[in-house]
């Protein structure tokens, strides 16, 4: 069994060429507020059911990879992701805590594996972060991550929009915009990662009311951190109407409501000459026409 070394990100300098250009990306999220709310959730006793599910899935996915990973980084996961027998496979694990900055202080080609859970959905410059991870991976190194996306909290979004339009004559952004599967696949390719794969794990959770759901969201540290969020308190009448609409549209026969969480899984490898590559145009030994003639009716 390998002896593990677990370290926190304390690096003060950034290697040349490792910084993305966050100024070029739109600033959607207040990451300082995110950090404060995650700390508040930690002190209050966090809701970890999604992280627990992702951790289990992460362990299974890593066990399926027949590869030894010595140097590993866990990027911005709000809690402990790698532990137990799976973590014992690694020589060192560097945990990078959630921060206001989106600059990863990781030397080039220093990692065999980069993992992250439930963090990338609140990144302003996700293409830049993926590019930084790609540079930090050794050739044939792996990125494996899970983020919230797709139709997550679509019920809450629709209920708030309907209630605000009815009670206040307008709609304010309540739930962050989430990337979908196709977006993430394209970003992996744009970052220069080979063999990109994405899939989605839909989790439907039932609650007694919309207010119970919102309490769980607070305990995840995942309440509204949009820069353009509403800064004034929501009227009580709007909140009550939102909960009523939620129950009318998204409740089961027993009166409990449904909440959707889409966990998008993404993986990609730093390019290496040993990896399978697509055939170049014109390199096939048999043309389609010849194949059709060969297999067609006699």
Q: Which residues does each PLM region occupy?
A:
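N-terminal, positively charged/glycine-rich alpha-helical extensions of SAM-dependent methyltransferases
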Residues: 2-5, 11-56, 281-284, 288-289, ...
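A short glycine-rich, Lys/Arg-flanked "PGG" loop and its adjoining helix->strand segment in the class I
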Residues: 127-142
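Conserved alpha-helix/loop element of class I SAM-dependent methyltransferases that forms part
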Residues: 49-71
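A short SAM/SAH-binding and catalytic strip from SAM-dependent methyltransferases
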Residues: 112-127, 131, 147
